[in-house]
Amino acid sequence: PRPAALSGTVDGAGRLAAQGGVTVNSADEAVAAVRSAHDNGFRAIKFYTSMHPDWLRAGVAEAHRLGMHVHGHVPATLRASDAIDIGYDEITHINFIAMQAMPDSVVNVSNGFARFEGPGRYARTLNLDAPPISTLVARMASEGIVSDPTLVAFEGILNAEAGQMSPAYAAFSGTLPPQT
């Protein structure tokens, strides 16, 4: 895979839409947003979690038609394997990989805290060597699908014990004022 340094962002319009991205209300608008990003020199497009699956399909198809790298969050009602079926070249953030094994009550929730809290609650008990995670990882490897796990953003959610400081910060606990 070739990393894409320049990426536009697209999300479905609404109160939970990604800040700083282009928001869309239809498949046609998703296609137009991808074309605009391409025309402005972006080599990749990142989709966010508020995208309707039909809009996502249209945007991904257009991005690939234009030779763009497709990556991003996995929208509500979809799992990582669904995003790959639609055409993602990369899954961004480890919580969306973990989403493959989450219950529907987590997967079907729109963008928001539940998409973080769910993996925080359930990922600790996932067997990474068993389906559905092992199947997903094998598929990603065979198809050249990559992940940008951004572990630093999720380590505290996925590893911390209730009432204890995240291991990543414990070494620094005495070096900063308590209010930080």
Model-predicted segments: where are they?
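Divalent metal-coordination and catalytic microenvironments
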Residues: 3, 41, 63, 72, ...
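Active-site neighborhoods of metal-dependent hydrolases
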Residues: 5, 33-51, 97-180
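Active-site mouth loops of central-metabolism enzymes
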Residues: 14-29
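Aromatic/hydrophobic pocket-lining residues that form the small-molecule binding cavity
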Residues: 30, 56, 133
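Generic hydrophobic/aromatic pocket-lining and core-packing "Φ" positions
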Residues: 34, 60, 80-81, 137
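Surface-exposed amphipathic alpha-helices with a cationic face
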Residues: 56-67, 141
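Glycine-enriched alpha-helix->loop->beta-strand junction motifs that scaffold or abut catalytic
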Residues: 65-67, 85-91, 144
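Structural recognition of alpha->loop->beta junctions
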Residues: 79-102
